[in-house]
Swiss-Prot record:
It holds the Pfam family GcpE. One of its GO terms (molecular function) is 4-hydroxy-3-methylbut-2-en-1-yl diphosphate synthase activity (ferredoxin). Keywords: 4Fe-4S, Iron, Iron-sulfur, Isoprene biosynthesis, Metal-binding, Oxidoreductase. The gene is ispG. It comes from Treponema pallidum (strain Nichols). PANTHER family: 4-HYDROXY-3-METHYLBUT-2-EN-1-YL DIPHOSPHATE SYNTHASE, 4-HYDROXY-3-METHYLBUT-2-EN-1-YL DIPHOSPHATE SYNTHASE (FERREDOXIN), CHLOROPLASTIC. It catalyses: (2E)-4-hydroxy-3-methylbut-2-enyl diphosphate + oxidized [flavodoxin] + H2O + 2 H(+) = 2-C-methyl-D-erythritol 2,4-cyclic diphosphate + reduced [flavodoxin]. This is 4-hydroxy-3-methylbut-2-en-1-yl diphosphate synthase (flavodoxin). HAMAP family: IspG (MF_00159).
Amino acid sequence: MDSSAGVSPCNSPYGSGLLDVPLKLRPRASHYRARSLVIGGKEHVRALPLGGDAPIPIQTMWKEPLIGADLQSIVDRLLELEQLGCDVVRFAVPDRESAELFVALCARTRMPLVADIHFDYRLALRCMDGPVAKVRINPGNIGVRERVRAVVEKARATGTALRIGVNTGSLPGVVKRAVAARYADGMQSVNARAEALVQTAFAEAAYLDQLHFDRVVLSLKASTVAETVRANELFAQQSDIPLHLGVTEAGPLVSGIVKSTLAFSQLLSRNIGATVRVSLSDSMEHEVLAAREILAECGKRAGGVRLVSCPRCGRIGFDVHAFVRRWQKELFSLKKDITVAVMGCVVNGPGEGKHADLGISGAEDSVIFFKRGKIVRRIQVRDLCADERTRIIDAAFKEELSSL
């Protein structure tokens, strides 16, 4: 037996009183639109709108433990991430000492921060003593409902948003068994696993609804594109709760970006998704830049530098790869709405790069700079050593860039 019908939150497999009150659904229109929510805004922390017509914020997660870290170094790094386009950063808070450090960190940055809590609900309570923007909990491992209620009441009192994170790896057994019984192949199909995610999410959302708490973001994550897309589609068809998009355990740089791009592009094209994180076994900077580019290509984020560059071939007259590595971070930190082209030879530049506001290209024994297809500077590099060549090229590029 297979099931292709929509998921009903009123028929949750949780049972045993865990879903006593059905979720008051606010059905979406066919174009989908999440309800509006503002996170942050407490004390000195920047207020960040999401859902509704708000731009889609980019999130990353801090990659190291807080214990033993220098807080000022973290604050400085957060500023760098913000300049690249990051809007929110989530921190793992696994113990009391980390919670104390997290509260201290919140007091020192304008960046909206999220506390990621598992197992011990008291850590969530402590984190909300500071100007935290949002607390992420997984009710599946927080414990009894009274603990979730305590978190909700503290969030209400402090004006803190909550994100309920539901992952395929931590679905309640009762949900999996109930859903598996309705499918011929049990939990093996994409639809079954997606439905289990949605049923779990609805059960948690219904409990928060029962407590009259609506400062909520939900995430339904799987490690495959198909399950992630299907689960978020099913949920979005029946609720306007803002959704945080992500593919969990997406993998290293290349495969992780591919998975996130495929999932996000399908969902964002339907206006599903209020915030995003590209989860990578790589740097936070790459997570932010990948999310930024995905949103831009999906028409969901405007402004900033658009960097185009050729892949490089045997005609190379200019080291494209090295130049991009040197300049990428600075270019993406600029607030200018421009296109920059970095080309290896005259085949691509300035011809194929003529649309760029500023371009640089190799040309036999020289490097040329062009603006909107017109050559504005040429530098002879044949007799220059590598270091001198780099210095002169970078200085000229910086001068041309500053003139835009």
